[in-house]
From Swiss-Prot:
Post-translational modification as stated in the protein's UniProt record: The disulfide bond which can form in the large chain dimeric partners within the hexadecamer appears to be associated with oxidative stress and protein turnover.
Protein name: Ribulose bisphosphate carboxylase large chain
Modified residues (N6-carboxylysine): K201
Signal sequence interval, chain numbering: none
Biological process according to GO: photorespiration; reductive pentose-phosphate cycle
Gene that encodes it: rbcL
Modified residue annotations for N-acetylproline: P3
NCBIfam families: PRK04208.1
EC numbers for this chain: 4.1.1.39
GO annotation, cellular component aspect: chloroplast
GO MF term (any one): monooxygenase activity
Residue positions, PTM N6,N6,N6-trimethyllysine: K14
Family listed: Belongs to the RuBisCO large chain family. Type I subfamily.
Amino acid sequence: MSPQTETKASVGFKAGVKDYKLTYYTPEYETKDTDILAAFRVTPQLGVPPEEAGAAVAAESSTGTWTTVWTDGLTSLDRYKGRCYHIEPVPGDPDQYICYVAYPLDLFEEGSVTNMFTSIVGNVFGFKALRALRLEDLRIPPAYSKTFQGPPHGIQVERDKLNKYGRPLLGCTIKPKLGLSAKNYGRACYECLRGGLDFTKDDENVNSQPFMRWRDRFVFCAEAIYKAQAETGEIKGHYLNATAGTCEEMIKRAVFARELGVPIVMHDYLTGGFTANTTLSHYCRDNGLLLHIHRAMHAVIDRQKNHGMHFRVLAKALRMSGGDHIHSGTVVGKLEGEREITLGFVDLLRDDFIEKDRSRGIFFTQDWVSMPGVIPVASGGIHVWHMPALTEIFGDDSVLQFGGGTLGHPWGNAPGAAANRVALEACVQARNEGRDLAREGNEIIKAACKWSAELAAACEIWKEIKFDGFKAMDTI
């Protein structure tokens, strides 16, 4: 038995497996401006050196396979292979390493998130030599990002379409999420929009079920929008979920929404898929529709710290695939979202240029060049007492979405919407006057209660509601 066979057998490999590190571990490599760079959190099997594990990730996510093949001689492996160019230990965990991999641009089809992910987060995640693998971040070079359309419209165009400036936008997910008839659903939309919200929203799992077919819902929601607009003088919208079982059906629903003259549609981009999402995004730009994105299924992919893919990667992928809004967590509500990490990927969604900042989980400097930004949506377990914190954390270019925090108001839907609008206007005015929302938030809300009975009632019913005491899973 050769020494190579003995070594491989001792760590669970079979004879004939080649040493990946001989070809794919290249610490001397200087990355190119056109490379796609990836940071993987790697947990090797016992006995597998980190250099071999990192090289295996680079190989299996690019050109490599488990043995030498004769067709390697028919191409330039050095031109096309991924390279593990740097490895660093994870502080506090001696069994984990951050392995940096560079991929040449020619490995990927232009304008295809689907193809990019098929390589980078494909079969390699089931590789036996690894106990766990997580993609922490990607650097998308301008040479690749410029092959994508990106968001259909972007932040500034949306504000111009809505004629709303200088404050966050307000939304509400209609509840109960399933079971309402189309007419009652439309009634709830109208009441919320008339009460002061900018948007109402289909829940992510509202598609076209027996209790409410999509066409009926679209018609009643459009009626609600036009009635609320006529009464308030403000432009209103409802996120009509176009997600469907086929791309053809999805586009048919988007076409009907456009024919109704509504401003925005919605897609569940992970369950619907990146190919479908990019298709819908292109349609929305060509036809003047805004596109709201829900991230249903993201926690299956991103919640475990050791395995899967961080949401900042999914956020970058969405910006390339296309969407004008995306749910991003709240920091203060019922859903997972640590402040600095959340603000890190919020910047990756909105800003043109984001510096590397490991304290916020950003492994690479990212330059989006001229790609439009995406508005983050804070949604999940929030109410009027959270308004100062949300305004301070997310700033103006955001959507603050209160579902139960609107529809759970003791006086009804319209008063619930009015309470949220008054709270937001009070916080924006206080901020513009130079007051500290983080420190004075409760006092600002209490003062506004004196001239809004709707807000006072909301503050009373939700004064004890908190979602504290749970340990965050997503930490640096």
